[in-house]
């Protein structure tokens, strides 16, 4: 495998997480992650969520559901505390079974995952350590004055590394003698350090399917606001969301409009808007609809969402209701 670095930027390795619409099925089946038959995204999500639950034993989800609801893992069993009532997750409402794995997995993948060292398989970890130790040994011996001709078997590997990892701290050379010994030694150290970063995740790429499933419109809106807020950090996380809900798009539009007019709003009025912590530059967002197998962008020149299939269907229903309302006679 060849890794090419563009614009002198170090390669960033993503953690990819797919959250399927069937997540409430995973939540409704005890110990689902222990099943290993087949090779599908539902199982991969079960493994990701299981990893999240290992790390997050307690979680308050009240802010999304607008009522007192929390999760706790007790003796390896998942419990929900709903307005004081304790019940197994498998017996909870479909809304809770849908939002908990969504919420818990996202928190872990965007935040908690990066608070610990990534665990590699034993074979990969051994290979990483052996390679790093050998290259550092070469760097130390060169720094101590040993003749570079003694490292012919390492030169091709290291020169290829230098070219692959060329950045501000790693210099690309054609042969060892292109650099003084001390500088060559330093170059090896830097290359090993940069290469070591390739084993760690640098950002998360989320694929979220139907976040609106089993959720009230208010909860859908709160989810969008929360997601955009938690994604705003130095990791440069990304998300691809598929939806059939106009409420998801309405909430996203609020966030983009807020990002567009932020500088025009008096500071003391910013917090009056529910979406203020999730405002985002519309240029960072792309919105498409699928029409007869063709993708069509539904944003205007400012990036704001224009009329689309979901919005049109919503308006059509509203218009019919208003027409019928003309024939309604209030007996009072």
Sequence positions of predicted segments:
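Phosphate-coordinating catalytic segments in nucleotide- and nucleic-acid-processing enzymes
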Residues: 1-203, 278, 286, 293-297, ...
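C-terminal lobe/lid and adjacent interdomain/linker elements of RecA-like ASCE P-loop ATPase modules
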Residues: 194, 218-332
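Walker B motif beta-strand of ABC-family P-loop ATPases
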Residues: 205-207
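Walker B catalytic acidic pair
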Residues: 209-211
């Amino acid at each position: 495998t060849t890794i090419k670095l563009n614009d002198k930027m170090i390669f960033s390795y993503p953690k990819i997480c797919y959250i399927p619409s069937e997540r409430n099925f995973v939540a409704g089946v005890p110990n689902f992650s222990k099943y290993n038959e087949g090779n599908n995204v539902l199982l991969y999500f079960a493994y990701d969520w299981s990893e999240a639950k290992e790390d997050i034993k307690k979680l308050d989800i009240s802010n999304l559901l607008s009522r007192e609801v929390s999760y706790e893992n007790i003796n390896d069993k998942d419990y929900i505390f709903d307005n004081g009532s304790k019940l197994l997750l498998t017996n909870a409402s479909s809304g809770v079974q849908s939002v908990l794995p969504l919420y818990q997995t996202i928190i872990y993948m965007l935040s908690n995952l990066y608070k610990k060292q990534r665990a590699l398989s034993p074979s990969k970890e051994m290979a990483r350590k052996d390679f790093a130790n050998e290259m550092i040994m070469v760097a130390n011996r060169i720094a101590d004055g040993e003749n570079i001709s003694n490292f012919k078997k390492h030169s091709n590997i290291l020169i290829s590394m230098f070219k692959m990892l060329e950045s501000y701290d790693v210099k690309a050379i054609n042969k060892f003698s292109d650099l003084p010994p001390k500088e060559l030694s330093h170059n090896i150290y830097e290359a090993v350090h940069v290469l070591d970063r390739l084993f760690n995740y640098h950002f998360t790429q989320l694929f979220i399917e139907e976040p609106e499933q089993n959720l009230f419109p208010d909860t859908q809106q709160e989810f969008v606001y929360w997601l955009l807020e938690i994604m705003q950090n130095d990791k440069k996380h990304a998300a691809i969301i598929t939806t059939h809900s106009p409420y998801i798009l309405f909430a996203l539009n609020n966030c983009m409009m807020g990002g567009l007019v932020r500088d025009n709003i008096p500071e003391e009025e910013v917090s009056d808007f529910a979406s203020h912590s999730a405002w985002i530059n519309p240029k960072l967002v792309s919105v498409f609809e699928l029409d007869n197998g063709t993708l069509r962008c539904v944003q205007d020149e400012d990036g704001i969402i224009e009329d689309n299939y979901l919005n049109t269907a919503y308006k059509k229903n509203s218009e019919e209701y208003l027409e019928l309302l003309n024939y309604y006679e209030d007996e009072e």
